[in-house]
Amino acid sequence: YKISRYLWYSFLKMQKQVAPKLQNIITPSQSSKKGIIEEFNCKKDNITVINNGLDTEEFSPIVGSVRDPNRLITTASADVPLKGLDYSLKALKILKKDNPNIHLIVIGSYKKGGHTERLIKELDIKDNIFFKKHLSKEEIRELYSTSSVALVSSLYEGFGYPVIEAMSCEVPLIATNVSSIPELIGKYGILIDPKDENQLSNKIRIVLSNYEDYKKNAIQGRQHIINTFNWSKITHEYEKAIFKTI
């Protein structure tokens, strides 16, 4: 999925003219850097990659919390095809056949009468899916801390905050191998092909069946997030980029 497929904002026409003339462009991932080079005809030496940061204390596992072995969690703007929620819903349908108690928490909302609501009805998973909206960061943290597996089934992410938020809360993560996601995860999560609910459901089964092993990897994943995306490091990188430019 290239950046060009989603050039729906009119201001991007102006950016195509301006971007090649800029001395330094800062972007949050190697994937987005590649897209800028291809779509805006910019020189690679004029683009600096600085990750977005995360408050890893706000997104941290709650001590003493118990993870529900039947609870999956995802963050998605329902009815937005890019977020790939359809494939998480279809995977849930597959898993429900063997485990009627499995359920998916979706941090987000859906449009009344929209595509997502219709798909949920078609798949007969209404009792297995719960949408949560207008949550505080502490409430999001609580949901992550009581979930066993986090899903990111996006088709494109310039920078996937749901990826690093879940990892910071030590939730074993399964995510699609697209755009920026692999560089965020490193070796601390499971990558799957996009648009493949069968592969997704199979990986969920594997994680739940070997949970202690994936839990250990998730603990290491949190340390990776702390080391890579802490605001002190990000701020220092911005300072260097700014001073280099001026």
Range-by-range predicted roles:
Residues 4-25:
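Membrane-proximal helix-turn-helix segments that form the acceptor-binding/catalytic region
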Residues 31, 53:
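Carbohydrate-associated surface elements
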Residues 65-83, 89-92:
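Conserved donor-binding/catalytic core segment of Leloir-type glycosyltransferases
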Residues 116-138:
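Nucleotide-activated donor-binding/catalytic signature segment of Leloir-type glycosyltransferases, i.e.
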Residues 134, 142-147:
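Short alpha-helical donor nucleotide-sugar binding micro-motif in glycosyltransferases
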Residues 155:
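Aromatic "clamp/platform" in nucleotide-sugar-dependent glycosyltransferases that forms part
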Residues 172-175:
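Short hydrophobic beta-strand element within catalytic cores of glycosyltransferases
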Residues 190-197, 206-211:
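Conserved acidic donor-binding segment of nucleotide-sugar-dependent glycosyltransferases
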